[in-house]
Amino acid sequence: AMFKVNDGFAATNGQHNFRILMLPDESNFMHQATEVMSNDRLGTTVIDREEDIYYNVRMRLKSSQRGRNNSRRVGFNLRFGADQPYRGVHQSVAIDRSDANSAHNTELMFDIMIANSGGLISRYYDFIKVLAPQDRHTKSAILQMARYGDVFLDAQFENGSDGNMYEYELIYSPNSADGAGNKLPSPDGVNGVRITDLGDNKEKYRWFFLKKNNRAGDDFSDIIAY
């Protein structure tokens, strides 16, 4: 377990503080250019709202291949232990810091309006101040809780998570490396496909239509039929 005392960064304007405590060597390793695209998770302790402490939380970076190595845009994805889900509900949450353009702020305002209008399908987000392992990443951010996952699906639809959900994605191929031959996240090549019939082989769909739930079933029949 880790703790921090009187660091002077806590929000005093009503924002919820979300502290992520991590060993400096591991944080530095995670942010190396050759490591930022790894989805391997490292251990952290999370302190929520200066009261609730979560141990053995596993964290990776969150953003695009260009954003993860950008201190203004990089975010975090945290997975909580099965014995201590976040706020008693969520096995994972994400923190979005990517305020690089005004479009991001517009999207956030739509999320807030939809969530508070009642009777509409919406994600559940919250404003926070993230106190990150590295001070340069400490700032206001968006805490993404019930994203388009099982908690969201079951809350909005009867037996919602029984179905299959896919996320359209592009494939990014690094085009450069450091002196040791380790790939760097950019520059890169980008490949995609149109939403069209790719045949009956699910491997043609796997990396363009990422399976977002019920992964153990490895079922791509719905997207193939679509």
Q: Regions from the language model: what does each represent?
A:
Residues 10-14, 37-39, 68-72, 86-89, ...:
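Extracellular/periplasmic catalytic domains that process cell-envelope and extracellular macromolecules
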Residues 40-99, 212:
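Conserved oxyanion/phosphate-binding beta-strand-loop segments in alpha/beta enzyme cores
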Residues 36, 72, 100-108, 213-221:
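Soluble non-cytosolic domains of exported or imported proteins
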Residues 31-34, 57-58, 68, 89-91, ...:
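Short, solvent-exposed loop/turn and secondary-structure capping segments
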Residues 98-133:
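A conserved helix-loop-beta module that forms one wall/lid of the active-site cleft
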Residues 1-56:
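Regulatory N- and C-terminal appendages and interdomain linkers associated
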Residues 79-87, 97, 119-123, 136-226:
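Internal "kinase-insert"/substrate-recognition segments embedded within catalytic cores
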Residues 55-58, 75-79, 92-97, 104, ...:
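Structural recognition of the beta-strand scaffold that forms the well-ordered cores
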